[in-house]
UniProtKB/Swiss-Prot annotation:
InterPro entries per the UniProt record, alphabetical: Flu_proapoptotic_PB1-F2
Additional free-text comment from the UniProt record: Is not encoded in all strains, and seems to be dispensable for replication.
Subcellular location(s) per record: Host mitochondrion inner membrane; Host nucleus; Host cytoplasm, Host cytosol
Residues at the site labelled High pathogenicity: S66
Source taxon at top rank: Viruses
Residue numbers spanned by region Mitochondrial targeting sequence: 65-87
Main location: host cell
Protein name (database record): Protein PB1-F2
Oligomer and partners: Oligomer. Interacts with human SLC25A6/ANT3 and VDAC1. Interacts with host MAVS.
Length: 90
């Protein structure tokens, strides 16, 4: 009897490449620098925790790239509160 094999495939949206490995795991590769378009193209089946983590990382990257005075003030205040509770951590 022939056993069905899981063959690798790649689906490209132009902004996100989704690659399925032989073991069934999917990997995402983001290839666009516009957060709105990235979020529009994210698969609906993605785990909410993974999506939240990716969103937080993306926002941090955008902040480091071009901080505004308000976001910089917020960032400094959060770090100061964290320092006063726990001490500095890198």
């Amino acid at each position: 009897m022939e056993q069905e094999q899981d063959t690798p495939w790649i689906q490209s949206t132009g902004h996100i490449n989704i690659q399925k490995r032989e073991n069934g795991q999917q990997t995402l590769k983001l290839e666009h620098h516009n957060s709105i378009q990235l979020m529009d193209h994210c698969p609906k089946t993605m785990n909410r925790a993974v999506m939240l983590k990716q969103t937080v990382c993306w926002r941090q990257w955008l902040f480091l790239r071009s901080p505004t005075p308000v976001s910089l003030k917020t960032h400094v205040l959060r770090r100061w509160k964290s320092f006063s509770k726990h001490g500095w951590t890198n």
